[in-house]
Structures are given as structure tokens and as C-alpha cells.
């Protein structure tokens, strides 16, 4: 989906506002909280909460979880009743005995490789590079590790540094000696825009979805 910078900033601002507001609608209805991921699909949830049929029946609020660990804890405690989740987390929670079910796959292909200077054109070109990745042992780290293994690329030859969250990765990427960062939207676009504002050439690398499809 093509998006102008102004539209992106509006959507990001709306998502941020939804994450901190106690409610997206007026009070007086049944409280209904959806816990969204720190990624572009939560914008869809925010719009749906405002304009969808559910909004007529419940006081819908959207809160954003910061990490998969927070998501797991929220489900285990019973606090999270309706939430967005990486597909692997949902499956693992179910296998662990949690009473959760997946309604649908909301989106795919939103995880991007963003590079500093020149684009990294293929997975093989990651060798010798310093890569910044959020959420160790979760998406997108699982995707990267599986891709390297499938293509028989020695993971020890790729220098991987982990950030706690995508926003933290966006902040670290320009000022450190990283060649690339793996980010979900809208954080990938935020990284590109930040590069422009501070005079650093930040570009898209190879298509992770295409590389995955070719490998598997």
C-alpha cells in the first residue's frame, strides 16, 4: 500500500493517541479493550474501534503492548481477552494450555529490512554486517534465524544486536555502527523518515517475504 508521508504521520499519531487514551469513545457503555501490537495493523484496529459496529455496543479502547513477553503475561493473567499477536505466539500460548483462539491472520509482509548507506541486496550479503533486531527469540528474530539456517548461512558470521522494542531499534540505528535493522511497519517507515531528517541515507534492503518464499 502506497502511503504519503503526511498520511503516515497522521496514522502514526492516531495510533500513539489510541495507545495512551483511556478510551476511543465516550463513556457509558460496556468497557471493551483490544490489545494491539506495536505495528501498522493496530491502526486498522483503531479505525475499526472508532467506526465499526462494535463501537455502537461497547466503549472500545485500544492499548498497545510493548513486547511479546508483556503479551504472554497479559494472556496468562487473564487481563488480555482480545489481542493482536504474532502467529507463533498465539500457537505457543495455545500449546501451553491457554484458552486462546486465532480469529484470522490480519496481515503479512509488514516486516522490512532497512539499511544504512547502500541496500543489502540478498541474505548472503548479511555476512560480515552488523544487524539490529528487536524482540530476541521472537518475531522477527525467528524469521531471520530460520532464513539463515535454511540458506546455510553461518549465523555466527552475522553480527546481531538485539533491541527490546522496535521504537528502541529506530532510536539506536542511526547513531550506532549498524548496517541494517529489521523493523515492522510503521517503524520501518519511521526509520526512513528519521534518516532524511538527520541527513543519513537510509534505504530498503532485500524483500524479506520474497527471500523467505524463495528459500522455503
Short names for language-model regions:
Residues 38-65, 69-70, 74-76, 92-96, ...:
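Short, polar/charged alpha-helical segment
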Residues 116-131:
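Flexible hinge/capping segments at coil-to-helix
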Residues 63-73, 86, 158-172, 186:
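Short helix-initiation/N-cap motifs at beta->coil->alpha
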Residues 29-41, 58-63, 128-132, 161:
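Short, well-ordered beta-strand elements
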Residues 76-85, 98-99, 129-130, 174-183, ...:
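Alpha-to-beta junction loops
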Residues 88-89, 168-216:
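Pocket-lining segment of extracytoplasmic ligand-binding domains
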Amino acid at each position: 500500500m502506497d502511503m504519503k508521508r503526511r498520511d503516515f504521520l497522521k496514522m502514526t499519531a492516531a495510533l500513539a493517541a489510541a495507545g495512551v487514551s483511556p478510551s476511543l469513545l465516550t463513556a457509558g457503555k460496556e468497557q471493551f479493550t483490544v490489545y494491539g501490537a506495536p505495528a501498522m495493523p493496530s491502526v486498522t484496529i483503531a479505525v475499526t474501534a472508532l467506526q465499526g459496529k462494535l463501537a455502537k455496543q461497547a466503549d472500545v479502547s485500544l492499548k498497545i503492548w510493548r513486547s511479546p513477553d508483556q503479551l504472554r503475561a497479559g494472556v496468562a493473567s487473564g487481563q488480555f481477552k482480545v489481542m493482536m499477536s504474532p502467529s507463533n505466539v498465539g500457537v505457543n500460548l495455545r500449546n501451553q494450555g491457554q484458552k486462546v483462539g486465532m480469529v484470522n491472520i490480519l496481515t503479512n509482509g509488514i516486516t522490512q529490512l532497512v539499511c544504512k548507506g547502500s541496500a543489502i541486496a540478498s541474505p548472503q550479503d548479511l555476512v560480515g554486517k552488523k544487524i539490529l533486531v528487536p524482540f530476541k527469540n521472537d518475531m522477527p528474530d525467528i524469521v531471520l534465524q530460520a532464513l539463515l539456517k535454511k540458506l546455510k548461512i553461518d549465523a555466527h558470521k552475522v553480527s546481531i544486536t538485539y533491541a527490546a522494542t522496535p521504537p528502541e531499534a529506530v532510536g539506536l540505528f542511526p547513531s550506532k555502527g549498524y548496517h541494517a535493522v529489521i523493523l515492522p511497519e510503521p517503524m520501518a517507515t519511521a526509520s526512513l523518515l528519521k534518516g532524511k531528517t538527520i541527513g543519513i541515507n537510509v534505504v530498503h534492503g532485500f524483500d524479506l517475504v520474497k527471500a523467505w518464499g524463495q528459500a522455503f
